[in-house]
């Protein structure tokens, strides 16, 4: 199984309940497509290096995942690009 790290930035003015629902939705996207979540945790609210979609800060969330194929990652990537609550995301394959 390959190991991946996903980092995504959520807009800072989102309500706590909506943020929890967003995280649960994207965690389920990964698990529904065959990935196993090792860890999913909120990192912290941080100042961005540059303005993204009129925001100077963002809520960072990090997910460590194991997957046999990249279907779950492709679906996560596709849906996070069209979701307005996620400002940016990054998927990195970790060394075994």
UniProtKB/Swiss-Prot annotation:
One of its GO terms (biological process) is translation. Pfam families: Ribosomal_S6 (PF01250). GO terms for cellular component: cytoplasm; ribonucleoprotein complex; ribosome. The keyword Metal-binding does not apply. It comes from the Bacteria. GO terms for molecular function: small ribosomal subunit rRNA binding; structural constituent of ribosome. Keywords: Ribonucleoprotein, Ribosomal protein, RNA-binding, rRNA-binding. InterPro entries: Ribosomal_bS6, Ribosomal_bS6_sf, Ribosomal_S6_plastid/chlpt, Transl_elong_EF1B/ribsomal_bS6. Belongs to the bacterial ribosomal protein bS6 family. Binds together with bS18 to 16S ribosomal RNA. This is Small ribosomal subunit protein bS6.
């Amino acid at each position: 199984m390959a190991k991946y790290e996903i980092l995504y930035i959520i807009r800072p003015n989102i309500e706590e309940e909506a943020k929890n629902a967003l995280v649960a939705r994207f965690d389920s996207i990964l698990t529904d497509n065959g990935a196993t979540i090792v860890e999913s945790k909120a990192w912290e609210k941080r100042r961005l290096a540059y303005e993204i979609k009129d925001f100077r800060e963002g809520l960072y969330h990090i997910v460590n995942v194991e997957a046999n194929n990249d279907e779950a990652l492709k679906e996560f990537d596709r849906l996070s690009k069209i979701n307005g609550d996620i400002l940016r995301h990054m998927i990195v394959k970790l060394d075994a």
